[in-house]
Design a protein with these regions (language model features):
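Aromatic (tryptophan-biased) beta-strands that constitute blades/sheets of beta-rich domains
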Residues: 37, 43-116, 150-159, 195-204, ...
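Bacterial N-terminal signal peptides
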Residues: 9-20
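Structural motif
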Residues: 233-237, 326, 379-381, 446-451, ...
Length: 598
């Protein structure tokens, strides 16, 4: 392990050691304890100087669209739950609950919190099924009572800690729960007890391949892939597993298969070859990780897979060509893994602009069947699925200097940066307003390239960015403080035209989920720990409060005993993002005394 990677690892051990419920494998236990105390001091300093949350809304005077929203449909029986990562398999994130609405949201308050006891990169997208709320940390899966936040059960796993300790959530199907691990496995658990039922290896941790994504499940299958596309030699694959046994039903290579690659199950048919990868000698085809969840069209049995960056991330001269299927949404037959089509959004990527979240599949007010997706390049893309043509590409955060090539002899500044744009959470779609809501990060990066010799010297299985830095916190490029440092954007964009109606700027980036409801609200949070309820029609803030640590995971809403509640994952701590050091918690909010649908 090189010194830079070890430094990052020590910091992550520090973030995850010595707290209630902790349990990293701890050969560095003493060292980590020291670093943890330093981390707590860092958190206190950040808390002292962190500004209060603030938002400002701007209306587009050129917007032409529907003057009034469509009438709300009555809640369906399924509205009581949030059964999948993005609620529906098609990922719209819309809830038809309206008990909490524009008229009473001012009375919203935190009712209870569940403390995981961990300092971790808390990105879990909770699910709510059969009266229990399920969440994950890097090492744990837990079930809590959504009425009281009392723990039903918690199952802890032991394996070596990863550079950034992340897990994005679990899937549910027929009494079983499923999650990935940072040592390359998929695990299944009994929903009621948390007992482990099976495990299947789908990635090679020695190569840098990990499984942080939230799976989805449908018709006896569990769909999940591996991340690790920033590590030399690592490749992305997509899998379907048998939900009862864990057996691999099919495997699909998201970048070309070459000699020596591991085949773990039957392969889905693919047209992919090496023609779009003209790599220089000694540079292995690398990248294409699928590090976030996926989307499924159950009517047509199609799986939509977002695919990450090629590597080395910042030097595309090492790998001339479009580098398929990186920077794409790949559509597969969900039953067989056979290739159907793809949409490449970021060809020849040199900014680390992954397609970083599941696309949403919607029927617009104008009668279109649309795929909308918002990757890290800072745009919202809308594709008409009738002919697969691009309808619009709308900027939804600051875009600057996006075309300048990177160089060995100078710094190049660009926006959005490598952790900018829309990250691992999907947009949300509100059928009542016909708006797509995107939550984005406005944060720039400065890059200077390594020499070709330095890039070639990187060992297999080590980070392979191509960027010249000795700061472990800048592994994804040097983040800029010179231009206002950072912000967040929430855009409301017409699903038919791609024109934005209103946009809201937050003084903290928006990494967490965006959730619209039939109550006329949009819920979101920022990495300042501020949680907001926004009027979906106008963009005006109706309620806001700091509810804990940085918000970068799920925001879901559901009912318990006829009462609507909202659950938020708070306490995101990452060596790449300067947030307050607070333990990971689930906050459950509601309005006391409100019961029944309205």
């Amino acid at each position: 392990m090189n010194r830079r990677l070890r430094l990052i690892g020590i910091v992550v051990f520090a973030l995850d050691a010595g707290v209630v419920g902790g349990g990293v494998t701890s050969s560095l236990a003493d060292e980590a304890g020291i670093e943890a105390r330093v981390g707590e001091l860092r958190g206190a300093i950040l808390s002292l100087f962190a500004p209060a949350g603030a938002v400002a809304t701007e209306t587009n005077s050129n917007y032409k669209g529907a003057a009034t929203p469509a009438p709300a449909a009555p809640p369906s029986p399924a509205a009581a739950d949030w059964p999948s990562y993005n609620k529906t398999l098609t990922s719209e994130r819309f809830s038809d609950l309206s008990q909490i609405n524009t008229k009473n949201v001012a009375k919203l308050k935190v009712l209870c919190t569940y403390d995981t006891g961990r300092l971790t990169s808390f990105e879990t997208g909770p699910i709510m099924v059969e009266g229990a709320l399920i969440g994950t940390t890097e090492f744990d899966i837990f079930s809590i009572d959504p009425s009281t936040c009392a723990e039903n059960w918690r199952t802890h796993e032991e394996y070596p800690a990863y550079i950034i300790p992340t897990n994005r959530g679990a899937a549910y199907l027929d009494g079983r729960l499923f999650r990935g691990t940072q040592d390359g496995r998929v695990l299944a658990y009994d929903f009621k007890t948390g007992k482990r039922l099976w495990e299947t290896t789908i990635a090679d941790a020695k190569k840098g391949e990990v499984v942080p994504a939230a799976p989805i499940a449908w018709e006896g299958l569990v769909f999940i892939g591996n991340a690790g596309g920033d590590f030399k030699g690592a490749k992305g694959h997509m899998y379907a597993l048998d939900a009862k046994t864990g057996k691999i039903v099919w495997q699909f290579f998201l970048v070309p298969k070459t000699e020596g690659d591991t085949v773990r199950g039957p392969e889905g048919t693919s047209p992919l070859d090496t023609s779009t990868w003209k790599n220089v000698p000694g540079a292995p085809i690398t990248g294409g990780g699928t590090w976030t969840s996926t989307t499924l069209d159950p009517a047509n049995g199609l799986l939509y897979v977002p695919v990450g960056n090629p590597a080395p991330d910042f030097d595309n001269s090492v790998r001339p060509g479009d580098n398929l299927f990186t920077g794409s949404v790949v559509v597969l037959d969900a039953k067989t893994g056979a290739y159907k089509k793809h949409f490449q959004l970021v060809p020849r990527d040199w900014h680390d602009w992954d397609v970083s979240n599941p696309p949403i599949l919607i029927n617009t007010r104008g009668g279109k069947r649309l795929m909308a997706v918002s990757p890290k390049d800072g745009h919202l893309y809308g594709f008409d699925l009738a002919d697969n043509k691009l309808l619009y590409r709308t900027p939804v955060t600051r875009i600057e200097n996006a075309e300048e090539p990177f160089a060995v002899d100078k710094d190049v500044h660009f926006c959005p940066g490598s952790t900018g744009g829309e990250e691992w959470n999907s947009p949300g779609y509100d059928p009542l307003t016909n708006h797509i809501f995107t939550g984005d990060v406005d944060w720039c990066t400065t890059v200077k390239l390594q020499t070709r010799e330095e890039i070639a010297a990187a060992p297999l299985g080590e980070p392979w960015m191509g960027e010249k830095t000795f700061n472990p916190f800048n592994e994804f490029g040097k983040f800029s403080r010179a231009d206002g440092f950072w912000a967040g954007w929430l855009y409301a964009t017409d699903a038919d035209t791609g024109m934005w109606k209103w946009r809201l700027k937050s003084n903290y980036p928006i990494y967490g989920a965006v959730t619209p409801t039939a109550g006329g609200l949009v819920f979101f949070g920022d990495v300042g720990g501020n949680f907001y309820a926004i009027d979906a029609a106008t963009g005006q803030k109706l309620w806001g409060q700091k509810i804990g640590g940085a918000i970068a995971g799920g925001v879901i809403t559901f009912t318990v005993n006829g009462t609507q509640k909202v659950a938020v994952a708070t306490g995101y701590v990452s060596p790449a993002v300067p947030t307050e050091i607070r333990r990971a918690r689930i906050a459950i909010l509601g309005i006391e005394g409100e019961t029944g649908s309205k």
